[in-house]
Amino acid sequence: MSGAPQFALRPFLAEDAAVVAQIFRESIVALTGDDYGEAQQEAWASAADDVATFAKKLGGQLTLVATSDGEPVGFASLEGKDKIDMLYVHPDAAGQGAGATLAAALEKLAAARGAEKLTVDASDTARGFFERRGYVAQSRNSSSIGDEWLANTTLKKELKGATP
């Protein structure tokens, strides 16, 4: 077998909590350094320090896990029916299609749930990824995490096939 890796998707399970929290942290530390300082990265990654609380948040949303050879390599969550809350891929799997697979699945699920649009507050690192998928910038934002301020951009995509 050759070509790009194939990623399977499945629902988030409680036993995924530790590995998904690790993916979250490692993705932030390894992939966002060109856009955010070390203190900003540490503040951002601290959201997964309490694995139980992190798991509870993901368990309360529609959360999918991307796997390669049965091992989790990324995850994404849909808040409500029309907002991507999180989409993170392990640095070793970045750029191989796991993020695109997760985003496409959330877009289909949102449309199936009747959403006419999908929004995301994308980090400066992820903004280009979403723009290549047809998302359009709506506003620039600053949010505080502890003593740190992080910039992001709210983007929106009109969904085709949404049911009225």
Model-derived regions, located:
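Acetyl-CoA-dependent GNAT
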Residues: 11-14, 22-94, 103-109, 113, ...
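Conserved active-site tyrosine of GNAT-family acetyltransferases
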Residues: 130-131, 135
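Glycine-rich phosphate-binding loop
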Residues: 97
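Conserved N-terminal entry element of GNAT/NAT acetyltransferase domains
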Residues: 1-18, 160-164
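Short secondary-structure capping/turn micro-motifs that flank functional sites
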Residues: 126-127, 146
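Conserved catalytic-core motifs of GNAT/GCN5-like acyltransferases
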Residues: 119-121, 136-154
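Residues at or immediately flanking beta-strands
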Residues: 8, 117-119
